[in-house]
Curated annotation (Swiss-Prot):
Disruption phenotype: Homozygous mutant flies are viable and fertile. Mutant embryos show reduced level of phagocytosis, but normal level of hemocytes or apoptosis. At NMJ, mutant larvae show normal patterns of synaptic proteins but increased branch length, bouton number and quantal content in basal synaptic transmission recording. Contributes to endodermal integrity and adhesion between the midgut epithelium and the surrounding visceral muscle. Essential for migration of the primordial midgut cells and for maintaining, but not establishing, cell polarity in the midgut epithelium. Can only partially compensate for the loss of beta-PS integrin during primordial midgut cell migration. The two beta subunits mediate midgut migration by distinct mechanisms: beta-PS requires rhea/Talin and beta-nu does not. The gene is Itgbn. PROSITE patterns: EGF_1, EGF_2, I_EGF_1, I_EGF_2, VWFA. This is Integrin beta-nu. One of its GO terms (cellular component) is membrane. Residues 1-26 form the signal peptide. One of its GO terms (molecular function) is integrin binding. Glycans are attached at residues 73, 167, 409, 505, 655. Residues 136-372 form the VWFA domain. The lineage of its organism: Eukaryota, Metazoa, Ecdysozoa, Arthropoda, Hexapoda. Its main location: membrane. Belongs to the integrin beta chain family. It is found in: Membrane.
Amino acid sequence: MTSLGGRAFLWIYLVFLIAEISHSDADSIDDQCRHADSCERCLSAHLECAWCTDKEYQVGYRCLSRRQLLNYNCSETDIYENQPVLDVLQDKPLKDYETSDQAVQVTPQRAYLKLVKGNTQRMKLSYRTARNNPLDLYVLMDLTWTMRDDKKTLEELGAQLSQTLKNLTGNYRLGFGSFADKPTLPMILPQHRENPCAAERATCEPTYGYRHQLSLTDDIPAFTSAVANSKITGNLDNLEGGLDALMQVIVCTKEIGWKEQARKVVILVTDGFMHLAGDGLLAGIIQRNDKQCHLNKAGEYTGSLNYDYPSLEEIYRELLRRKINVIFAVTEEVVSSYWELSALMKEISYVDILSADSSNILELIKKSYESLIKRTQFADNSPDFIDMAYYTDCGGQFPSLQKRNYCNNVTLGKQIDFYVDVTLKKYPDNQVYTHKIRVEETSLSEFMDLDVELQRPCPCQETPDPENEEGRFLCDYKGYLYCGMCECDEGWTGTYCNCPTDATNVTSNEALLQKCRQPFSDKSTSELVCSNHGDCDCGTCLCDPGYTGPFCECRECLDCDEKLADCFCGQCVCKYGWSGSKCNCDGDTDACVGPTGEICSERGTCQCEECQCEEPYLGKFCEIDPEKDNKLCLFYEPCVTCLIEQKQGMGVCENLTEICSSLDRQETYPYNFVHELDPEQDQCLVRLVNKHGIQCDSFFVYQVIDHSNFLTIQAVDCEPPDYVALVGYISAFTLLIGLLIIFIILWYIRAKDAREYAKFEEDQKNSVRQENPIYRDPVGRYEVPKALSVKYDENPFAS
């Protein structure tokens, strides 16, 4: 009995709790609704807000939830509310390509949407890459003098090219065209126009801009023959007219033979840079490229001297519009320039390095084609007042839905689901309420059409009738009925326009004061006139500065941008897609997601698409820690190590796709090896032991541009020491040291002797000589007198 009683109590408690939560939610909705002062603002405040147009409705708030309006006796037929609708009209199942029928790669194909302003409708869109889908591959080749070996290689690889394409799809066609540059000064010397190879002491074809050699065909021998019969030409500068030629390949649909349902690919092969829009001025060509086909019957581009080169934007838009992908197969010397170009149109372009003689072109075609079919991206033509956001987990590549309209590394035959959020941000200025929107795959003629109907603004606001007799009667003939409320004539106010704006005619002061009190509220201000924040003037609150609302119950929104937010009782309620205290941030954190997949490296917050880093972190993604290693340096280190080892002949990097691609296995990072990095750039260090067993320090820098990663690497290969030379150096060094020591010793001795001799001479100069007074010379001297002197020649003893 006790157990049964406990269970009963528990059930009663749960029912009470659910009812309390539901009541709380309803009150929350009503709080958002009740401050809307017009039908349109009411329906925009919340999806469940409704407006009462009942003439007999007595409650002050006409904008509440449908349930609350019915509770306050608003007639059900006079309630105008939001009514969103989603209905799928065509939903063919996904299927692969068959010769008797076309493939279906997108489902559903058509749907109906009724949109409510400020409300989001979510619908599911599925995509699956079809097997054996048709491929149209057009080879556009630079045939200037430096590409002569590449032409010969392509000619020899014709049969192998056929087999390569068969391995990719069983339904393919090939076309061929060539280009050089505009045949005029300064692109070519006039005297060399007929033979631009004269400087090389050779003969070649006169310079031309673009020549269409072979329309798309499944005849491989015809393709090989077209390549073989094409002639080498030349130009003066190192810039080519590739964009001129590419524009013609794109827009000359009939001449090239593009098939609408095929995957259309242009592979542009060159070893030079491109002329861009404006370069034509150098040749006196001022007319802008008209994006029209100008091929004569021989396939020659006749507008080369009439129209400037196209811009990258013009090329990009035409590629998108006609669903054509472009592969830039370029040499290593110019690849960095094409990486930057491809980053501007990454969803429809691919760049890879071409070997010096184009011998790797088959591998390049296979690799780039597989990369293209592994990527799917959707775009739409929605007007600016309708927002469309895409969410997907890319077939399980992410643990949760990510805000993105593309997926990489899509497996052939695997279904990818996208969830499309469609939101009506505002009503169109032209008051057109039916629209057609196409959501299409950017590389294929696969799409979903949306028939969109916009829920019109409140109908009662569209046809005001100031002269309606019944409406004027209800408004005391001093106004007219407008959406269930009296719109008073000048000089009158009040619920029924029975209060003159001249205060001297007030008949019932207490009745007018009552109109300045909130009709129902749980707040303590319900008995206060104008919430104690204003004065009651003829039944209408005149609010003090800083307050607003019918009863001055709300603070003003000082920082709300009216274009981005609505002010509801002192709070900025951001419109769809905007956030922040001032609603000036679009709420998209995609720009703050670094290569590691983390928002601001988990060291900051994303505000207005920029990382606001915590102290002491720095960098675009807060990846730099002044006291520790750079987080992105560590992220890229395995990839760079692998690339350096591969370049230095230490083996093939087998897991390159895994460690050198983004988290969703996007195409391998573009990279470039240089002899020396810019010392002004912040460099990352990678330390590895080379094949000689020597530890070497190499350096690299990374660039992240619109989620595309670029690596520039300075690989240092430390060579082993030359022992013979080392012994020679040591011996020579030892000999030099010995000679130096001997020289120093000799110099020291000589210097010492010189000092002592100088001292001796100085002492000699300063010495004084005199005899000692007590000194007696031991030698006596006697002098014989002259008288006793004898001549030596006389004999004194002679007689």
